[in-house]
């Protein structure tokens, strides 16, 4: 018995085998709709932020500190 899955876009049953040209989608149209949703950022993979902006505030960092040119990189540019 072949494995069947539902198309992520329209929920149509799709047979999962070598003959399924657009798996897991039922058609090229559904595949492109899904791609468009990802491109428009309607879908997203949740990730944990690398740092908490509030933590930077607690440590005393100010946004202006990140963009200051104090000349410390001048020696490394040469």
UniProtKB/Swiss-Prot annotation:
It holds the Pfam family YacG. Binds 1 zinc ion. Coiled coil: none annotated. Zn(2+) binds at residues 7, 10, 26, 30. Its cofactor is Zn(2+). Keywords: Metal-binding, Zinc. GO terms for molecular function: DNA topoisomerase type II (double strand cut, ATP-hydrolyzing) inhibitor activity; zinc ion binding. The keyword Iron-sulfur does not apply. One of its GO terms (biological process) is regulation of DNA-templated transcription. The keyword NADP does not apply. Interacts with GyrB. Belongs to the DNA gyrase inhibitor YacG family. Inhibits all the catalytic activities of DNA gyrase by preventing its interaction with DNA. Acts by binding directly to the C-terminal domain of GyrB, which probably disrupts DNA binding by the gyrase. This is DNA gyrase inhibitor YacG. It comes from Shewanella piezotolerans (strain WP3 / JCM 13877). The lineage of its organism: Bacteria, Pseudomonadati, Pseudomonadota, Gammaproteobacteria, Alteromonadales.
């Amino acid at each position: 018995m072949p494995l069947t899955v539902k198309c992520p876009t329209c929920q149509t049953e799709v047979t999962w085998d070598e003959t399924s040209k657009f798996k897991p989608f039922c058609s090229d149209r559904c595949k492109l709709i899904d791609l468009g949703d990802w491109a428009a950022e309607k879908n997203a993979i949740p990730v944990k932020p690398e740092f908490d902006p509030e933590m930077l505030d607690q440590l005393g960092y100010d946004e202006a500190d990140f963009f200051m040119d104090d000349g410390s990189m001048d020696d490394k540019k040469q």
